[in-house]
Amino acid sequence: MLDFVKLMMGQDPKPVRALVEIYTKQASSACIRAKWLLCHKGVKYTEYRIDQDELAAITMVDRTGGRRDLPQIFINNQHIGGDSELDRLNREGELDHLLAEVYNY
């Protein structure tokens, strides 16, 4: 909806070019909220379900410096945090900028 409003105001939404990864588990309302926001923005992300993949859980804890709360989100290998941090970035208008950055493999 926000992209539609920006388009109507003459502000084209930036295309998503970033590498987005999210660590989740089933039936987590915070994970569902984060995935909904990403989908709403047209983001294609890689999801790692730590309740189904022990190696993903270990990797998440290592990549986040010990955080175990879910979800944990990375954009272009930069640790963003959880759903509240993602929501804050979105409200402040920074999320679209992060998502528009090209990931160099």
Language-model-detected regions and their locations in the chain:
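Post-cleavage N-terminal segment of exported redox proteins
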Residues: 2-4
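Local sequence-structure signature of Cys/Sec-based thiol-disulfide redox active-site neighborhoods
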Residues: 6-46
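Short beta->alpha junction loops/turns
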Residues: 27, 50-53, 78
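Generic recognition of short, well-ordered alpha-helical segments
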Residues: 32-36, 59, 84
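Thioredoxin-like thiol-disulfide oxidoreductase module
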Residues: 50-68, 94-105
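Non-catalytic, surface beta->alpha helical segment in thiol-disulfide oxidoreductase systems
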Residues: 75-105
